[in-house]
Amino acid sequence: MQLIKYISTLLLAFIFIISCSGSSMPFKEYKDATALRDKTIRYDLQNYSKEQFDIAEANYSEAAILIDENKDPKKAKELLTTASNAYQTVLNEGLPKYAAILKEETSVEREYSKEIKAYKVDKDNYELAELNYLNALSALGTNNYEEAVNCLLNVKKYHSRAYFTTKKRYDESAKALKEADAKIKELEELRKSSSK
């Protein structure tokens, strides 16, 4: 009797698993769409292909609701596939444009760093910036826009650090020189007044 109960329980569990397997929620598609969505938002590409982004967001939101409510996995999968395709379109259209803008911005920042001679004062950050710039140019040459954008964002970060570190040191030096000049003038005045 015990054996029959055990086999019946296993059989029911097996039937339940088989019946549910055909209608499982599309978690892989959800993960893929979420990854593409996160990239789009991280790089702030929403406005480069607004229509596609809106389509992606609408489909993604509707699919998320279906998944949360554990309803209609087939429709959720279709919505997530549509969302992923739209997010990919936004990335494909937006990343090259964003990379071009960043390249222009980093050219200005590189010039500022060179003018202030950051390569002498903050050599580490300056060299990291230049290395990332070369990597960005290489990535642009192979149309790897995501890598180019990441490198160009690093260029901005490192050149900014190098520039402001150098500026701070120059400002401190200028202040010290001004104070020294004031002290020298004060001493000269004292010497003149004492020699009379």
List PLM regions with ranges.
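Bacterial N-terminal signal peptides that target proteins for export
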Residues: 1-8
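Long, charged/polar, soluble alpha-helical segments
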Residues: 20-196
